[in-house]
A protein has these predicted regions:
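A contiguous strand-loop segment
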Residues: 1-95, 122, 127, 131
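Glycine-rich loops and low-complexity Gly/Arg-rich segments
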Residues: 29-32, 39-43, 101-104, 168-171, ...
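A short, charged
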Residues: 46-60, 110-114, 118, 181-194
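Short, glycine/acidic-rich beta->alpha junctions
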Residues: 62, 98-99, 137
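Short acidic/polar capping segments at secondary-structure boundaries
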Residues: 82-84, 112, 123-125, 148-151, ...
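Alpha/propeptide regions of enzymes that mature by internal proteolysis
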Residues: 93-124
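Secretory/export targeting leaders with adjacent low-complexity proregions
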Residues: 118-134, 142-145
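Extended amphipathic alpha-helical segments with heptad-repeat/coiled-coil character used for oligomerization
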Residues: 133-193
Length: 194
């Protein structure tokens, strides 16, 4: 099971780490991207387009996706598997963003979690999932972002709707269950963090 953790230490030190527990080789590489790159949401008709504001370094998966990374402002984004994820049907009236580019979009455009959450709340584009490279199943993922202040947000699609969980307290995320259930479990198990 993949896990993402944010640690806030003394003197303003913040570190984000994650485990990648996948059953097959994801053919991962490190990619470094400069600012000023023209990007495309890779969804075909009416794909989202943007130019990166920030440089970033990312880990790739299957040579097509940015799964984890950090930009020059200290924003970190991580994609983790979420079997319960359910995305809305494609609405071509909204620009589309492939789920494989979700991390990169965050890193390219936002310096802080507050900025990312405020923009996502405007609901101006649609995240679009696709089949895994082996064709076995739909990619079902949720996204976490953290920043240099230790602020955190979790973005999940369930029942076709996006839910955003935003708090400096949301420092741990695993694959499953959905984040509302992870929070409920956390409140039942306070002795684990004593």
């Amino acid at each position: 099971m993949c896990t993402r953790v944010v640690y806030s230490g003394t003197n303003g030190m913040v570190a984000t780490g994650r485990s990648m527990d996948w059953k097959t080789d994801m053919h991962s590489n490190l990619w470094v991207f400069p600012r000023g790159m023209e990007r495309n949401g890779e969804t075909g008709e009416n794909s989202l387009k943007w130019v990166s504001k920030y440089g970033s370094v990312v880990t790739s998966a299957f040579e097509i996706a940015s799964t984890d990374g950090m930009n020059e402002k200290g924003l970190v984004a991580n994609l983790l598997w979420l079997p319960e994820a359910k995305y809305p049907a494609r609405d071509k009236s909204k620009p589309g963003l492939a789920i494989t580019a979700w991390v990169q979009y965050m890193l390219d455009n936002f310096a802080t979690v507050d900025e990312a959450v405020a923009f996502i709340d405007e609901d101006t584009f649609q995240v679009v999932s696709d089949m895994m490279p082996d064709g076995s199943r739909l990619a079902t993922l949720h996204l976490s972002v953290s920043d240099a202040t230790g602020d955190c947000a979790i973005f999940e699609y369930t029942d076709g709707k996006l839910t955003v969980y935003h708090s400096k307290e949301y420092k741990v995320m695993t694959n499953s269950p959905t984040y509302n259930k992870q929070l409920a479990l956390d409140s039942c198990l306070p002795f684990l963090y004593a």
